[in-house]
């Protein structure tokens, strides 16, 4: 489970995220959407314990990420939009490294299945610097799954993937949710978010415009349009926010 309460993040004089609160239950997939600069990546990086929050409470699988970061990080995995791999390690050596870091002893069979699932078996002995952008993304996803985390966060996971890769990635995320993981997916591919996610969080200029179920978002931003797409909801929400700000100013 992920619990975020009254979360703020500032960089010097810049407010990146302001008073954000939300929860992601086990088995849920939350779609985190917003324009560039909305605060999405800052939110994910703070929850993952990569950068500290300015204030607020961030709890991952029952552990406060600030007060108890080691315990929290054992339960989570974060896949950034541009995964940093070790150039001279092979794909299999990356899995071996992650298994050692998380003290996973029975990882080899799981690793083989992950490589097979993501079409990486034939490349298992290839070093990272020789991999395409999409393959590097797949390696990062396999590494994220290896220690069977209770919390998973993805920042633009579709980047670099071909259509088959996108399908495999989407199916694997849905499968992880069915197994009980709490998942956040941040993406500009709104149709993919709509396909995967049961709940939605719209960020705009660091503020939460909406948090709730997808059907509630349709009611809020599209009235009686029960068939409104996430793209329509997104533009109704963000453009409406801009109009309100313009009126107030």
Task: Give, region by region, the residue ranges found by the protein language model.
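ABC ATPase "signature
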Residues: 211-212
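Conserved ABC ATPase "signature" region
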Residues: 96, 100-123
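Catalytic Walker B motif of ABC-type/P-loop ATPase nucleotide-binding domains
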Residues: 152-156
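Conserved ABC ATPase signature
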Residues: 127-134
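Helical segment within the ABC ATPase nucleotide-binding domain
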Residues: 166-179
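Conserved ABC transporter NBD signature motif
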Residues: 56-67, 71-72
